[in-house]
Each structure stands twice: as structure tokens, then as C-alpha cells.
């Protein structure tokens, strides 16, 4: 069954709602240019209220290594997701398992993937204006090719309306959604979250 990550969590209410709906992982954005940015202190409070067996992922963009590792410790992150141009060496120095994100323009966007030895690879649509959360899709055929590198997490413009088609096309390890289940940036819509997870898991 496809794993589901709900990203851009900013409140304990949204976190618990997503878990109740069946989310496997929650994502917290530690990037001050994102409308879903959350400070480590607040994220730690939310994470401290979660039940067991939920994976907690921290998303970082071009952050200093010390900040990444300190935040991972403070917030008890299970996984660090690096969404910028972080090097293979940088990834190896993170003290958590790493998901490396790649923003896809075309098939050449995959050229750097085999440099990395990480736990998973997240594929998102390229935007010159933002690192994720754009609501833009990309050619899913590219994601099919990328599966040769390891576990693929499909992101970029996923919604309750297209997630079934996306999974049928790619058969990814997991899917990642943020803006596609929101009523406003950083505010999750319970009905959309429930429907997305239901369709992603074929329930």
C-alpha cells in the first residue's frame, strides 16, 4: 500500500486530524520563505503530542548543517527532507535518514540522482519561485524512470482528484501532498485530507 505524507503541518489540530485520517507521515517545514514555515519550538510542541508509529519529517532548504541537526534533535525528527541544492556530502553529515528532493523540469533533472545514497528520493515539479508546495504537476513518466535509483516519493500538484491516476501511473513508494489538501496556505482541509488518503490507499 502506498505511503502517504501530509506536509506543511502547522497546528496540533491538523496533525491529529491527518493521523486519524490515515497519514503515515507528517511533514514540518523549517524554511522561513514558505507560507507553511514553523519554528522548531512550535514543531516540537506539536510532535510531542503525537501518538506512536507516526513518522515525523523535517523539510529544510539550503539550511546550515548545524541548524538541521539541532532541529532534528530538538524536534525528535525521524527523517530529514532536503529540498534545496544540498550536496551528497551534506546529506551524509545529517544525523538522520535523508530524503533528497529533486525538482523536475524534464528527464535531465534525474542526472544527479545516482550521486546520492539516501533513504528515499522525492520528485517535485520545478518552479523558479518556490521549493515545493506550488500545486504544479510534472510528467509522471519521469518518475517511472527514476524508480531505478531507489524508493520514490511522488509530489507536485497532487490532489484528491489526481492521486489515484498518479499512483496507477508511477506505483511510487509514497506520495506527498501539501497545497492539494489545503483551504489556505498552511491550513489543512479535513475533507480533502481524508479523501486524498482514502484514494491514495485505495480504501
UniProtKB/Swiss-Prot annotation:
Pathway annotation: Amino-acid biosynthesis; L-tryptophan biosynthesis; L-tryptophan from chorismate: step 3/5
InterPro entries tied to this protein: Aldolase_TIM, PRAI_dom, RibuloseP-bd_barrel, TrpF_fam
Keywords noted in UniProt: Amino-acid biosynthesis, Aromatic amino acid biosynthesis, Isomerase, Tryptophan biosynthesis
One BP annotation, GO: L-tryptophan biosynthetic process
EC top class named in words: isomerase
EC number annotated for this UniProt entry: 5.3.1.24
Transmembrane segments: none
Catalytic activity: N-(5-phospho-beta-D-ribosyl)anthranilate = 1-(2-carboxyphenylamino)-1-deoxy-D-ribulose 5-phosphate
GO molecular function, one term: phosphoribosylanthranilate isomerase activity
Stored PANTHER family: N-(5'-PHOSPHORIBOSYL)ANTHRANILATE ISOMERASE
Similarity section: Belongs to the TrpF family.
Name used for this protein in its record: N-(5'-phosphoribosyl)anthranilate isomerase
Amino acid at each position: 500500500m502506498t505511503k502517504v505524507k501530509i506536509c506543511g503541518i502547522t497546528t496540533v489540530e491538523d496533525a491529529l486530524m491527518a493521523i486519524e485520517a490515515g497519514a503515515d507521515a507528517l511533514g514540518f517545514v523549517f524554511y522561513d520563505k514558505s507560507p507553511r514555515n514553523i519554528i522548531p519550538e512550535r514543531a516540537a510542541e506539536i510532535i510531542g503530542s503525537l501518538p506512536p508509529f507516526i513518522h515525523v519529517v523535517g523539510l529544510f532548504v539550503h539550511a546550515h548543517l548545524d541548524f538541521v541537526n539541532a532541529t532534528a534533535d530538538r524536534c525528535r525528527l525521524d527523517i530529514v527532507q532536503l529540498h534545496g541544492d544540498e550536496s551528497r556530502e551534506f546529506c551524509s553529515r545529517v544525523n538522520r535518514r535523508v530524503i533528497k528532493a529533486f525538482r523536475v523540469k524534464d528527464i535531465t533533472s534525474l542526472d544527479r540522482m545516482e550521486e546520492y545514497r539516501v533513504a528515499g528520493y522525492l520528485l517535485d515539479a520545478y518552479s523558479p519561485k518556490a521549493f515545493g508546495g506550488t500545486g504544479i504537476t510534472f510528467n509522471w513518466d519521469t518518475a517511472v524512470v527514476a524508480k531505478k535509483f531507489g524508493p520514490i516519493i511522488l509530489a507536485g500538484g497532487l490532489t484528491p482528484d489526481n492521486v489515484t491516476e498518479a499512483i496507477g501511473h508511477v506505483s511510487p513508494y509514497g506520495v506527498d501532498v501539501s497545497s492539494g489538501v489545503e483551504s489556505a496556505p498552511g491550513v489543512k482541509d479535513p475533507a480533502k485530507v481524508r479523501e486524498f488518503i482514502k484514494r491514495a490507499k485505495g480504501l
